[in-house]
A protein has these predicted regions:
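Long, basic/Gly/Ser/Thr-rich N-terminal segments
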Residues: 1-156
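Short acidic, glycine-rich loop/turn motifs
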Residues: 41-43, 166-172, 444
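Extended helical coiled-coil dimerization/tether regions that scaffold
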Residues: 117-188, 238, 251-261, 276-366, ...
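ABC ATPase nucleotide-binding domain signature region
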Residues: 58, 66, 72, 91, ...
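Switch/communication elements of ASCE P-loop NTPase nucleotide-binding domains
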Residues: 173-225, 232-235, 347-481
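Intrinsically disordered, low-complexity regions
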Residues: 73, 80, 145, 161-163, ...
Length: 519
């Protein structure tokens, strides 16, 4: 097996001796380290395999482009090491046979294949900052090592679920705390969605934002933040997420927005993601910021429509149209969608017609369709995906929210995904078993996680609102309103003002106030 490097500058070596692999130098920047290459494997003139991205680092490097041989080579020098982007990379090469993958991984000194290569770099800054930067890298090393020792390709099984323990803090002056999200399957209970609730200001969005950074490896402000785990860290075994999809339609979210330089923008344009990190939302980086500053703006309706069409195009390219229609079935049963002709919308291949239909939808319908389409477009399918959704109820009527939740769950089931939803909605809790609900509390500068006091699944909205969201009588104003009215008016006069008979609780309260007055 021979290797040649296609350099970004200067002359590049060539070879016509099969088999060989071409390593195309990328200009992606991992906080000063440029170690990314795209690999194409040529076994013959007709057998060509696009293998995707790999990282190659040197033990003695302090940054810049990885120094690579300027001539064809069969093995990298001692002190070099490589790692593929995901398990799919290793499975593709494994399927080509031992006579291919052994010289290939030996030649690139792959850390999943060669323990000595791993030992030579694992204490270096480049290993942590570049090689392990993106989500799932450590898990990929472990899984690939098992694969490459297996006598035959193991059968890929869908995950039975797992726990994710995450230690973080949500404000500079707050404590570090650990939250455990539980996705383990228990019988036929719906296990793929965890709900996160808490009062405004407790830090729910910040918690999800930190989790997105750590799970994906994208979004640290500086190299130092990455090295000191500024956003948090996983406790125990790292989760097996290949892709992280962030969904937020709040103008005030704190999620990291990709596209901070031209390299990132170009990659987003080509692939729709940055090494597995996907942001679906309202905010966009502004190009009008003064030098050295970063500001944001809200995306225009035309940009949102363009993103929807782009996601729909990716669904077609991935041949997932049928899966998308299955995912949309719960929405098709919602009365508000039955009037739209949703099936016709997605069956139409004329983007101008689709754009016109999308343009005429309500804001809630646009949000729902865009989210579900983007999830179907970007969710991995080959390895688990983490989906983080921040307060989806903002734009949605409760019945539409319930239908949306069913569609999200169907998408997660279809493609082996898992979601965490930060919410204030009792509708979402009504659809979620309490063992999959986490309550974030804050007192002064101390955060902690507690469990709901009741079983939330299938409970009435009123009980959930009172017992879980703590909306007691003291939190509402209707008592004061009725007390003021009852001091001057009879029950009959009050009901005449409303135009309908009051409910049991209101009538009882008015009568009790009238009794006090008459005494």
């Amino acid at each position: 097996m021979r290797f040649v490097v296609s350099f970004r500058e200067g002359e590049s070596p060539t070879t016509n001796r099969y088999p060989y692999a071409v390593l195309v130098q990328d200009n992606w920047d991992d906080y000063g380290y440029r170690s990314t290459f795209q690999v194409t494997l040529h076994l013959s003139s007709t057998e060509v395999f696009e293998l995707g991205n790999i990282k190659i680092i040197q033990a003695n490097s302090t940054g810049g482009y990885t120094e690579m041989p300027r001539r064809p080579f069969e093995q990298l020098p001692v002190g070099y090491a490589s790692l593929g982007a995901d398990l799919e990379y290793y499975e593709t090469i494994y399927k080509l046979g031992r006579e291919v993958f052994r010289p290939y991984f030996e030649g690139l000194r792959d850390v999943a294949f060669d323990d000595e290569a791993k030992a030579s770099v694992e204490d270096t800054e480049g290993y942590r900052v570049s090689m392990l930067r993106f989500g799932g890298a450590e898990r990929t090393i472990a899984d690939a090592a098992r694969l490459l020792r297996a006598p035959t390709l193991p059968t890929r099984r869908r995950s039975a679920g797992f726990r994710v323990k995450f230690k973080t803090r949500v404000a500079r002056d707050s404590n570090h705390f650990t939250v455990e999200f539980d996705f383990r399957r228990r019988g036929r209970l719906p296990n793929r969605i965890n709900a996160l609730i808490g009062y405004n200001g407790t830090g729910k969005t910040r918690l999800l934002s930190n989790l997105a950074i750590v799970a994906s490896g994208y979004g640290y402000s500086t190299k130092e933040d990455l090295l000191r785990n500024a956003a948090g860290r996983f406790v125990g075994t790292a989760p097996p997420f290949k892709t992280v999809v962030v969904v937020s339609y709040s103008a005030f979210d704190t999620f990291v927005i990709p596209g901070q330089n031209q390299v990132e923008k170009d990659r987003l344009q080509d692939e729709g993601e940055l090494f597995g990190y996907v942001y679906c939302g309202l905010r966009e980086r502004s190009d009008d910021a003064p030098d050295g500053e970063q500001t944001y703006r809200l995306r225009t309706p035309a940009e949102i429509q363009g993103e929807f069409l782009s996601a729909l195009s990716r669904v077609r390219e991935a041949d997932r149209q049928q899966e998308l229609l299955e995912v949309l079935k719960p929405l098709l049963r919602d009365p508000s969608f039955q009037r739209i002709g949703l099936t016709q919308l997605y069956a139409n291949h004329n983007d101008d017609d689709i754009a016109e239909l999308f343009h005429d939808l309500s804001s809630g319908h646009k949000v729902v369709l865009k989210i579900v389409t983007e999830l179907t477009a970007h969710i991995s399918g080959s390895e688990p995906t983490l989906v983080l959704i921040d307060e989806p109820e903002t734009h949605l009527h409760p019945p539409l929210l319930a239908a949306f939740l069913k569609s999200v769950r169907a998408c997660l089931e279809a493609f082996d995904g898992y979601a965490i939803i930060a919410t204030h909605s009792p509708v979402i809790l009504q659809e979620t078993p309490s063992k999959y609900v986490r309550v974030l509390r804050r007192a002064a500068d101390q955060n902690r996680i507690v469990a709901p006091s009741i079983e939330t699944f299938a409970e009435t909205i009123g009980v959930i609102t009172q017992e879980v969201f703590n909306l007691g009588d003291g939190s509402t104003d209707w008592h004061e309103t009725l007390k003021t009215l009852a001091r001057r008016n009879s029950l009959e006069e009050i009901e005449e003002m409303f135009g309908v008979r009051l409910g049991f609780a209101a009538r009882s309260y008015v009568l009790s106030i009238r009794d006090e007055i008459e005494e």
